[in-house]
A protein has these predicted regions:
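Metal-dependent nuclease catalytic core centered on acidic motifs
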Residues: 1-35, 61-130
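A short acidic/basic microdomain associated with nuclease active sites
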Residues: 30-48
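Short, solvent-exposed polar/charged micro-motifs at secondary-structure junctions
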Residues: 46-50, 124-127
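Conserved catalytic cores of phosphodiester-cleaving nucleases, focusing on short active-site segments
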Residues: 49-62
Length: 130
């Protein structure tokens, strides 16, 4: 992923209520130099953030099973074709999750962009691994 500056920025509008795990993802992206803006809540399903003017849905499941990856990608695609998958709350090893994300990206299924945030706060662009 392309960096814009030494440190990016996180914008949280007054009518947005991000979850703590979503704020964590935004902070990691901003520290890598990206501009992140949370999207205000509405009554319809909307993505969570703008990342460099592109909408993304953040998924950070709490599970100890690898099948949570596919289930959460499917849920994310109901809102947006661009997904950020955060493994910090999963009890599955990052290398297993990464393999599953690459597999799902190769299968297509409506995904345009897929970013993986590891337990060590590493940002992995899955497109580069496909």
């Amino acid at each position: 992923m392309q960096k814009n500056a030494k440190h990016g920025k996180v914008v949280i509008p007054s009518d947005a209520s991000p979850w703590p795990h979503e704020k964590r993802v935004a902070r990691i992206l901003a520290l890598a130099g990206h501009y992140v803006e949370f999207i205000p809540e509405t009554t319809i399903k909307t993505p969570d953030i703008y990342l460099e003017r592109t909408v993304y849905e953040i998924k950070s499941p709490t599970s100890n099973k690898l099948d949570a990856v596919e289930r959460n990608l499917t849920r994310a695609l109901e809102k947006c074709p661009n997904v950020i998958f955060d493994s910090s709350r999963m009890k599955v090893r990052d290398n297993q999750i990464r393999k599953e994300l690459v597999k799902r990206r190769k299968a297509g299924k409506g995904l345009k962009k897929l970013i993986f945030i590891t337990k060590q706060d590493e940002i992995v662009d899955i497109e580069e691994l496909v």
